[in-house]
From Swiss-Prot:
GO molecular function: glutamyl-tRNA reductase activity; NADP binding
The reaction(s) this protein catalyses: (S)-4-amino-5-oxopentanoate + tRNA(Glu) + NADP(+) = L-glutamyl-tRNA(Glu) + NADPH + H(+)
Binding site for substrate: 45-48, 101, 106-108, 112
Matching Pfam families: GlutR_dimer, GlutR_N, Shikimate_DH
Domain of life the protein comes from: Bacteria
Gene3D superfamilies: Glutamyl-tRNA reductase, N-terminal domain, NAD(P)-binding Rossmann-like Domain
Domain notes: Possesses an unusual extended V-shaped dimeric structure with each monomer consisting of three distinct domains arranged along a curved 'spinal' alpha-helix. The N-terminal catalytic domain specifically recognizes the glutamate moiety of the substrate. The second domain is the NADPH-binding domain, and the third C-terminal domain is responsible for dimerization.
Organism whose genome encodes this protein: Clostridium beijerinckii (strain ATCC 51743 / NCIMB 8052) (Clostridium acetobutylicum)
Protein name: Glutamyl-tRNA reductase
Length: 401
């Protein structure tokens, strides 16, 4: 049975923190888990804790063992969900396609799932069923994003402002601040064909980290030398006061687009009154964000059929795998019948040509009926009637002579 144990989505942060998975203890975790489970993958990120497994234990017994291995307090069991079979692997396909991410359709989770799968491979914790499941889910996630073209709809403030600036044909930029948001802004900017970015920072040593000739790292004291030569400012500092003021900007000149991603604001209110400026603050950007989230959600639902196709294929593969022993037995029976019939004929005929012909005819006849029986079992298994038909076919073909 393929199953999944995970932390519920609405679990408060202070409770989520109690479900710690320590990366340094993976060797110990996998060692203990594989004593109880046939296969296991640990997916642990800052927003997600999920254990995928292949086992035959009952749910209560399984939960207790998992809690013991990870040293979790069983008192918090109510914050955990457990599901199995199709619901479990549907969840993984949805995770890889971005349906369960805080930012719908984001790419990061796909890399995290891939890392978790490769980690399990290193510890020899996956074999056939989870191996196939994770390969299919990762492939599905890649194809889903590509065909749904989610990249066309940015849903984070940093990606939105870059997208909006590029639409306005800006090519010369100034980015103020190089914290988490600033780094994302730079990443998105440098993925486009822009001309120049003046990166304004307090620590000029940051220039050693950036290997791109389009980037000029400058200090806040130097920013006013270049501020009137650019077309767009993106400000994302943590300063408690404005860092872009009216006196910094010349009243004459071409249009200047300014995006202020900071709270409190980086850009002085009066800057918006200048005739050449267009100023957008975090509230304006958030409205674009809300619209984009709805657009992205609609687009993802429109393309859910891509995920459902992979889900169906895996489900069918799993069902057919469950009857592999029956197929193997049928082929063995067919081969036994063929060999016995050929042996009987060989004793009755001395003509080598006749014996060779008999070999071919008996083999082809045996293969025809066995293969047809296998086709019927596969068809009926996928319809959900496999057990009944396996019983009938075994009665026909596997009766002792």
């Amino acid at each position: 049975m393929i199953g999944l144990i995970g932390i519920r989505k609405n679990t408060p942060l202070e409770i989520r923190e109690k479900f710690i998975v320590k990366s340094k203890k993976y060797n110990e975790y996998f060692g203990e888990l594989l004593k109880e489970l046939n296969e296991v993958v640990i997916l642990a990120t800052c927003n997600r804790t999920e254990i995928y497994f292949n086992a035959s234990l009952n749910e209560e017994e399984l939960l207790k063992k998992i809690f013991d291995i990870f040293n979790w307090d069983y008192e918090y069991k109510k914050y955990v969900f457990i599901t199995n079979n199709k619901d479990a692997y549907r969840h993984l396909f949805e995770v890889c396609s971005g349906f369960h991410s805080k930012i719908l359709g984001e790419d990061q989770i796909l890399g995290q799932v891939k890392d978790a799968y490769e980690e399990a491979l290193e510890f020899k914790a996956v074999s056939l069923e989870l191996h196939r499941l994770f390969q299919e889910a990762i492939t599905c996630g890649k194809r889903f994003r590509k065909e749904a073209k989610l990249f066309e709809i940015p849903v984070s403030s940093s990606s939105i402002v870059v997208s909006e600036a590029i639409k306005r044909e800006c090519t010369k930029f100034m980015v103020l601040g190089y914290g988490e948001v600033g780094q994302l802004v730079m990443k998105y900017l440098l993925s486009h064909k822009i001309q120049t970015v003046y990166l304004v920072v307090r620590n000029p040593k940051i220039k050693d980290e950036i290997q791109d000739e389009r980037v000029k790292v400058i200090t806040f004291e130097e920013k006013n030398k270049y501020i009137n030569s650019i077309e767009c400012i993106i400000s994302c500092t943590s300063a408690p006061h404005p860092v872009v003021k009216t006196e910094d900007i010349s009243e004459s000149g071409s249009r200047l687009v300014i995006y202020d991603l900071s709270v409190p604001r980086d850009v002085e209110k009066e800057v918006a009154l200048l005739s050449r400026t267009e100023v957008y603050n975090i509230d304006t950007i958030s409205r674009i964000d809300d619209e984009n989230k709805k657009l992205r959600k609609d687009k993802m639902e429109d393309n859910r059929h891509i995920m459902n196709k992979y889900l169906k294929e895996y489900d069918e593969w799993l069902k057919l795998r469950s009857i592999s022993h029956v197929i193997k037995n049928l082929k063995t029976v067919g081969n036994d019948v063929y060999e016995k019939r050929v042996q009987t004929f060989s004793h009755k005929s001395k003509d080598k040509n006749d014996i060779a012909l008999a070999h071919k005819l008996i083999k082809s006849t045996s293969d025809f009926y066995i293969n047809r029986a296998i086709e019927v079992i596969k068809e009926e298994t996928l319809k959900g009637c496999g057990e009944e038909w396996i019983g009938i076919i075994e009665k026909i073909f596997m009766t002792k002579e």
